[in-house]
Amino acid sequence: MTAPLNRKMYFLTDPIEDRAKDWLDYKINYQATFAAQLMYPMVDTYEVMPWPDRIYQGLYRIAGTDQKERIPRSYSTQMQVMINTLNDIRTSDKQISGTHGIGVLMANSLMFQRFPDHNGYDDPQFSSFYGQTLPLLKRGIPVELVHMENTPFKDTFNGLQVLVMSYSNMKPMKSEYHNYLADWVKKGGTLVYCGEDVDPYQTVLEWWNTAGNAYKAPSEHLFEAMGLSRNPGDGTYRFGKGTVIVMREDPKHFVLKGGNDRKYFETIVSAYESKTGKKIEIKNNFMVERGPYTIAAVMDESSSKEPLKLSGLYIDLFDKDLPVLTVKQINPGEQGYLYDLNKVLGKVKAKVLCGASRIYDEKVGKQSYSFVAKSPLHTTNVSRVLLPRKPGKVLVNGKAEQPEWDESSKTLLLSFENDPAGVNVSIEW
């Protein structure tokens, strides 16, 4: 959506929500949205915590009860670990796993068609948009969103092979957008139009039926721009070097009833494979690597109910105890956020790899490592520290500690009470 304009984007994920739910529900949704934002490698700027006092001091329900409490220690630790990792996240040219090159057209006017029911026509819960996207997404295809208002910019169509669109849930605010779409098809693109063009918004007074125009629907103008009749039926048509596929069904029907998306999905598969000569990869998960971080999500309602199993040497960043794992299983409906230790072992002498506090004043000596850890009061720091060997001495604010050592990962598991003024940690080996 923003790539053609070279705009800087900030992602926001919230550890709690405005709706009245419980802490467990907030945690589950936070993990999902946090993983989702990391699956866009072109973005590395984030708003991490809107209204911190609302998060740390607000009272919210305990799961399964009517009692309310402030944020649980376990959740604040996990949340702070997750947020701290964002300091290391950088943009990358790596792509999320799956078949790329399939997009769905959207426009600002999506926001205008929210009337729930009019003259017997409805589009419940944004179904026409989800009807175009979810049948692809749920089969592991990282469908792209293409903004109609960006079509005048040449980079908008970069890498795009198949573009799906419908005017059942949005309308073009300018006729000129059709010229850019038609030009893209003429040069070799494949456009899939889904829609019956019977919703009430087709008849609002707009450019396609005023000022000398007499189109019954804006799609008539688009089809005419591509050398077709104003109202072509179901079928496949050629225009220049490209292809136009017409499906006379509103995309809401693809998702309002189970199994109704089959014809639509088969149409997209055929269009993509005919255009590229490549097979579409169908799967139930997405995964991307960003530096030492591996982000994965396994979907429910997908092509398979199998879990995703990752083998290696990882720290589980969605677990407050930061366990070291050799196998991570992610079930349908779940996400995983892992630190890949194999990407740092032997490359870094000493470093706090992850933790629930911000690290300052790091000093690495021949046989020592020290730092200051800062984080909010009434929260617990848990961190994993990479060292060349098992330490002989660990001091936390001058007090000797005996934290857990993991030989396989060469990491020390530290835990102590956080302090915004700073906690001094000194390690010798």
Role assignments for model-derived ranges:
Residues 171-368, 372, 383-384:
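A conserved amphipathic helix/loop scaffold
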Residues 133-156:
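A short, well-structured beta->alpha microelement
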Residues 301-303, 310, 376-379, 386-392, ...:
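Short proline/glycine-enriched turn/loop motifs at strand-loop junctions of beta-rich domains
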Residues 1-129, 232-233, 245-249, 254-258, ...:
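Hydrophobic targeting/anchoring helices
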Residues 47-48, 145, 165:
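Conserved beta-strand positions
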Residues 157-170:
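Short, well-ordered secondary-structure micro-motifs within conserved domains or adaptor modules
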